[in-house]
Every structure is written in structure tokens, then in C-alpha cells.
Design a protein with these regions (language model features):
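Catalytic domains of riboflavin
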Residues: 1-263
Length: 263
């Protein structure tokens, strides 16, 4: 179900995790008016009938936490404007997505390491788009880590908060017509943020990290990392001053996505 997240796949995974034949029988529970029951109704039904209840999201989180799903495939020296780093390429065994870790200095003790989990943004990271703060955050994170003398950047292939490059460009079209970044994703049929940080946590653990200081403004990212056994130290904020092109974007991240940004 890590390739396709659905109830059918979840039934098969539950059987497999129980050590049984990977097959299952599913049914849809209806409300009295004939509509499909949703989570609140299903939780009540389960409680009334003494049935164990879990969500698809909980099953995904369990697998990400307990199964190793990424492995390193290549490693090389990477000279940059922020010093010389070590770049490690990883492949996801489930969907074959490729991610990288940039390692600066010696992080072998695994303790109190400065870390940035950064989701891919072609427009911001490569073309220096002013619509978002992604490119600025990546550059600033590299500067902070270089000044610290050691740290890690995990660069995840999660373009457009997980919707992909072309869908992100479609979202930009909607933003040009007045939608904000959350509304645009929703109008395209996506949740505001589809990113998952479990793979990033697995990469950090593979590098031997135990406790980290995350460079982020996103509380959801911190919860996502802590849930995989990493100890979190003090958060390091990374706030770009607003300008005409990104002011609305930053307001939306603060007001609708819960990012820790100033008023």
C-alpha cells in the first residue's frame, strides 16, 4: 500500500503483517440514510461493536517506522559555494523515487546534528523563483550548516508539496487568477500538503543520526521526524523576509498550514 494508499491495499497489508496469506475481504459500512460512513461514524461503530479501529494513515506510518524502505546506492564528493560536502544518493525500494543527502563535516557521533529536510522545488531551488522561499531556505540552510562545521540536508523528491512539477505549475496558474497556494491545490483535487517525512527520517537514521536540531518553520515536519525515533533538540527557524512576490504565500503558510512565521 505504500505504492497506492487505499483500503483494498490496507487489507492485504494487514494480513501480510499478521503473517497470514496476503489477501482480505473488505466491505463498506453505510449510514442509516445510505451514505458512506466516514471516520467519525466508523469510530463510533467500532466502539459499539468492540472492533479494533485503525486508519490507512496509521498503517502507512507503522510501515514507514518499522520497515527499511530506502537504501544508499552512490556516494561522492560535492564541492559547492558553501564548502565541500558529501552527497549520498538513496533509492526508495517501494516506488523507486530517488532522494539525496548532503553531509557536511563529521556527523558520526549522531548527536545534536543540525539538519534540514528539504522538499524538491525546481522553480525555487534551480530557477530562483521569487514566488516561494524554497531556494532561499536551501541556500540559507547550507550556509548555517557550513558555519556550524557539520550537518545534513536531506533533499526529498516531493515537488510541489507532493503533487509533482506539472501539477504545481497548474497550481501556479490558479494562483495567478487569485487563489492562494492552499486553495490552488484543493481546486486541483489535492490536499494542501501531501508530503511525508518518514523517508527523510529513515535516511537520517541510515546516516547514524540519533538527535537533531531541525532547521524548519513547520511544526508538522518536527512531529513527522520525532515519530520515527529521532530525538529533537531546539528548532532553528529559517524565515525569509517577505517581499512583494511572496508575501501572500508566506501569509498562507502561516495562517493555513501552521508554519511558525511572524505576523
Amino acid at each position: 500500500m505504500l505504492q497506492r494508499v487505499g483500503h483494498t491495499e490496507a487489507a492485504v497489508d494487514l494480513a501480510r503483517l499478521a503473517g497470514r496469506l496476503p489477501s482480505g475481504v473488505i466491505c463498506e459500512i453505510l449510514n442509516e440514510d445510505g451514505t458512506a460512513a466516514r471516520r467519525p461514524q466508523l469510530e463510533k461503530f467500532a466502539q459499539e461493536h468492540g472492533i479494533t479501529f485503525i486508519s490507512v494513515a496509521q498503517l502507512v506510518a507503522h510501515r514507514l517506522k518499522n520497515e527499511r524502505l530506502v537504501h544508499p546506492v552512490a556516494e561522492a564528493r560535492l564541492p559547492t559555494d558553501h564548502g565541500t560536502w558529501r552527497i549520498v544518493g538513496y533509492k526508495n525500494d517501494v516506488d523507486e523515487q530517488e532522494h539525496v543527502a548532503l553531509v557536511y563535516g563529521e556527523v558520526g557521533d549522531g548527536e545534536n546534528t543540525l539538519v534540514r529536510i528539504h522538499s524538491k522545488c525546481l522553480t525555487g531551488d534551480v530557477f530562483h523563483s521569487l514566488r516561494c522561499d524554497c531556494g532561499w531556505q536551501l541556500d540559507t540552510a547550507m550556509s548555517l550548516i557550513a558555519a556550524e562545521g557539520r550537518g545534513v540536508i536531506v533533499y526529498l523528491d516531493q515537488e510541489g508539496r507532493g503533487i509533482g512539477l506539472l501539477n504545481k505549475l497548474k497550481a501556479y496558474e490558479l494562483q495567478d487568477r487569485g487563489a492562494d497556494t492552499v486553495e490552488a491545490n484543493e481546486q486541483l483535487g489535492f490536499k494542501p500538503d501531501l508530503r511525508n517525512y518518514g523517508i527523510g527520517a529513515q535516511i537520517l537514521l541510515d546516516l547514524g543520526l540519533k538527535s537533531i536540531r531541525p532547521i524548519t518553520n513547520n511544526p508538522r515536519k518536527m512531529v513527522g521526524l520525532e515519530g520515527y525515533g529521532l530525538r529533537l533538540g531546539d528548532r532553528v527557524p529559517i524565515v525569509q523576509p517577505a517581499h512583494d512576490e511572496n508575501a501572500e504565500y508566506l501569509r498562507t503558510k502561516r495562517d493555513k498550514l501552521g508554519h511558525l512565521l511572524a505576523s
